[in-house]
Amino acid sequence: IIISISLSIAYYLYNSKKEYESYTIKLEEYRKERNNFLNNSSSSPLRNSPYKLSYYDPNVNFKVIASIMQKERIDTITLATSTGNSERFIDFATLNFKLGRSKFTLPVYKYLEGENKGDLFFCFLDKTNNNSTYPGGRYIDIEFENAKRIELDFNKSYNPYCVYNEEFSCPIPSKRNYIDMEIKAGEKLSK
């Protein structure tokens, strides 16, 4: 029995290490693509900017499965932007997830107008803001269509474009989007 348990533990640890290595490789590829776009695209906010992207080390503890609760009643919400204006969204759904031992429920919005009309928008604030990350929060690109669950990977969180270029107007997350912990994952401010 002891040998069987030891073999099971060794197998689990080996597979966990392999999964982590595979995940890290995929995340690094994602970051390289993002860096390539932001450093080379003519539509990039980093064009003519000295800003360099900086990331936290990959951390699989910040990759979670979130349950989706779509709203039965559609409301609109207005978020302030980095340029002092405001932008309207549909208060579309909530994501329920667990990080460590804490449970969180954060809203997902849908763009109501503009070039992103109909796209989902997930933003958050956390305890790293004003320290190692942008004070106005970070974003994660998500998509789902009639799904009940979604992978929410904070390692793919990024700074809004207004961090790199003041000409961009970026929605600022509301207090409903606050995660009461440090999310040391994804993009951070470069030093």
Task: Map each language-model feature to its residues.
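Hydrophobic membrane-insertion alpha-helices, especially the h-region
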Residues: 1-12
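Acidic, glycine-rich flexible loop segments
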Residues: 122-158
